[in-house]
């Protein structure tokens, strides 16, 4: 039901450069913002029955992701530290990357993080604009890239950060999730059903919340 494997970060193939009749802009999206974008998830581990959530979800340590038919998980490892740095959730041709990080107790991180994301995109020759999305203000990005075959291409994405209690979950929607409202909606629900397990240890803002491969089910006793 789920396929789990390790990959490097941002290892999704870009789309080929569109013709003049095509658009490279992300589509608009399934729903605007609520007064509380997190009222329907993702959840903090203190807000739910943690034991039941672990039974219903794939346990990656810092993230619990609900099982969905056809869902694939690709653990992404930071090349410098060798530690898991995020997870790519793939459904058909759509994907969402999720990266959980620690945040201050008194304030969230997304307001300042999205400014840096937009600046980085523009520095790389791409475009970035803010828009309303299901998790609040998001950043819609289009980056110029080169395929392994040497062709010019673009990679559109939608980046949303969700501030929780002492954590932020950064989500980047890719592939069909950018161009198909239906595919986007399916992955939005995956994000909403996710549980963040930060832990109680002190952590500086921006530090990655530890992830790990899922544990194999224990063999039943004879």
Describe the predicted segments one by one.
Residues 1-2, 8, 15-16, 24, ...:
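Long, low-complexity intrinsically disordered regions
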Residues 4, 32-60, 66-68, 72-155, ...:
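Conserved polar/disulfide-associated segments of primarily extracytoplasmic proteins
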Residues 7-45:
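N-terminal intrinsically disordered, low-complexity tails
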